[in-house]
């Protein structure tokens, strides 16, 4: 399908006038001029062919960085993400070089095979989490922002009282308050929050993770959960194998001499020992969130518990079943990328609630599935 492009218009600029039709009775229409074949016409044709409309990711207002023609994105700071990659690759490389040959000879060949499978799965989940659009919602256009501001101002009852900047919607019998985002110029859909690091509104915002270099939201949460879960298995596997290697190697001498002979194994042991507890705790915490259909942001704020409210309220997004919540969080359909939607697909439509879930305005997600290209 042909890619849709758009042309950026600066805020406040007047839209280009539409072509006027010839009035009746004003004479015959002008005859088109035949283009000349001189050097000036060739230069104009080449310059017109070289000019193309800007893609949305090229003028993206957030703090993200894009690669491979907008297909990959990353947060503005990538140093912590690089540290994560270095720690995983270094520890696994040392394990394959200094521990796997001994364990494969004395125990079984399945140890390096299992380790390599876990390593490749961890790295693939990490890269998917880091380079995937987490669910960024496009900001309102100047016309949409002006129309919304006019609607908000008309709700004010007096001259000294500011107009309300919140809305209330009913979801599964529970009242949910929508807040207005002054940066994106729109009312945030339920479970949406504005990330101060990336400067974007992210749907089903969980948290901003510097270790993966990206926000964790609706579109990449399943990859993040698979990453921390597989990383906990890989760290525990390497930790157990290194202890087994050192134990078997120290049978012919003292354990201290064995540690002096294998400094690389000691380094792996230290890295795994200090990281395994936090990774296992994080995996258990997010397993509880997945089973409850909660986000880290909602759990910290106590949105559906008595941590914040005087009366305990139930989670309106929960399906009252652990299996149903896991399927909804990890296996649900993904919306199109907000950074790839073209402006011709953006047009207002009435907001509605459908089957207990919020349907965002069609200007966000009405891009056709086949035309959501980069």
Q: Model-found features: residue ranges?
A:
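Membrane-associated feature with strongest affinity for ZDHHC
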Residues: 2-208, 212-374
């Amino acid at each position: 399908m042909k890619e849709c492009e758009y042309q950026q218009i600066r805020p406040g600029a007047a839209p280009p006038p539409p072509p006027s039709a010839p009035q009746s009775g004003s004479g015959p229409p002008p005859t088109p001029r035949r283009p000349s074949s001189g050097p000036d016409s060739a230069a104009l044709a080449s310059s017109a062919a070289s000019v193309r409309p800007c893609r949305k990711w090229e003028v993206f207002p957030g703090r993200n960085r894009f690669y491979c023609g907008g297909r990959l994105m990353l947060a503005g700071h990538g140093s912590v993400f690089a540290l994560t990659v270095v720690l995983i690759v270094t520890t696994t490389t040392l394990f394959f070089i200094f521990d796997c040959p001994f364990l494969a000879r004395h125990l079984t060949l399945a140890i390096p095979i299992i380790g390599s499978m876990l390593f490749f799965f961890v790295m693939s989940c990490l890269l998917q989490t880091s380079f995937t659009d987490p669910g960024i919602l496009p900001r309102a256009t100047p016309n949409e922002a002006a129309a919304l501001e006019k609607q908000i101002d008309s709700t004010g009852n007096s001259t000294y009282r500011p107009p309300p900047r919140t809305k209330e919607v009913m979801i599964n019998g529970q009242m949910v308050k929508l807040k207005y985002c002054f940066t994106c110029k729109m009312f945030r859909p339920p479970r949406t929050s504005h990330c101060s690091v990336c400067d974007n509104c992210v749907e089903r915002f969980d948290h901003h993770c510097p270790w993966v270099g990206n926000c964790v939201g609706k579109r990449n949460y399943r990859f993040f959960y698979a990453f921390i879960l597989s990383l906990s298995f890989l760290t525990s596997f390497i930790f157990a194998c290194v202890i087994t290697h050192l134990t078997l190697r120290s049978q012919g001498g003292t354990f201290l001499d064995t540690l002096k002979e294998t400094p690389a194994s000691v380094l792996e042991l230290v890295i795994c020992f200090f990281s395994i507890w936090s990774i296992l705790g994080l995996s258990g915490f997010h397993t509880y969130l997945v089973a409850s259909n909660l986000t880290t942001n909602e759990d910290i704020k106590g949105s559906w518990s008595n941590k914040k409210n005087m009366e305990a309220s139930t989670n309106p997004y929960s399906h009252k079943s652990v299996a149903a919540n896991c399927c909804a969080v990890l296996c649900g359909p993904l919306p199109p990328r907000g950074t790839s939607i073209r402006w011709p697909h953006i047009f207002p439509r009435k907001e509605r609630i459908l089957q207990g879930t919020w349907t965002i305005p069609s200007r966000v997600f009405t891009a056709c599935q086949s035309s959501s290209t980069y």
